[in-house]
């Protein structure tokens, strides 16, 4: 296999990562008339993960190595308004302290800003035993020039829409069904690279285009004992 073929060959990885952390959470809730307001703050979770690696052709996941993988702190605000006895509207805002969360190789320093989320939705009690809902979410990431991203794992700013239903199937049981769709924006990351081919070094300019779409269907059962 030539040097160029080696650089572009597939890589195999079999690695399990484990870790634990504690997250203190402070929250407040206030109700007045038809309004309900809430806020919470989740502290940054100091979190290390350890590699248990069986196969690693990438050279990035050495067995037994611990790496930082903190969960960022979150500041969230929300409000709900009772339009009628059966119709409710709500909105919320989330701010993630990504740049304060330690990551492998300190890649959080490549972010240009912290993540922000904007959410809004409606709930409607169609029948005493049936509630339907719909909502949307806008997520904005501060990705800077893209140095934070890699094809191993990535996120880009996104739009999401979702629909759901809650059905009472017994006095102490409720069936929940939900579907949501997320479209991630295109983000182009440009960089220069030197490739060895036929005994020579070739300088190339690359552009990686990151995007994806998620479609999720969820079903759950709530039981009160």
Per-region residue spans from a language model:
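Outer-membrane beta-barrel porins/channels
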Residues: 1-225
């Amino acid at each position: 296999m030539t040097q160029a073929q080696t650089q572009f060959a597939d890589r195999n990885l079999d690695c399990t990562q484990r870790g634990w952390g504690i997250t203190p959470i402070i929250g407040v809730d206030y109700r007045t008339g038809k309004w309900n307001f809430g806020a919470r703050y989740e502290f940054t979770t100091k979190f290390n993960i350890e590699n248990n690696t069986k196969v690693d052709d990438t050279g990035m996941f050495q067995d037994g190595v611990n790496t930082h993988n903190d969960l960022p702190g979150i500041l969230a605000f929300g409000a709900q308004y009772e339009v009628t006895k059966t119709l409710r509207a709500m909105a919320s805002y989330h701010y993630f302290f990504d740049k304060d969360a330690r990551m492998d190789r300190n890649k959080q320093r490549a972010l240009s800003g912290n993540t922000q989320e904007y959410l809004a939705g409606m709930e409607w009690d169609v029948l005493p035993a049936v509630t339907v809902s719909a909502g949307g979410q806008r997520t904005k990431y501060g990705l800077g020039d893209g140095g934070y991203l890699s094809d191993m794992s990535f996120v880009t700013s996104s739009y999401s829409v979702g629909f759901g239903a809650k059905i009472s199937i017994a006095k102490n049981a409720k069936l929940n069904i939900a579907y949501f769709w997320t479209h991630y924006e295109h983000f182009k990351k440009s960089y220069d690279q030197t490739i060895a081919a036929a005994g020579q070094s070739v300088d190339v300019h690359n552009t990686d285009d990151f995007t994806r779409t998620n479609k999720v269907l969820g079903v759950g059962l709530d039981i009160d004992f």
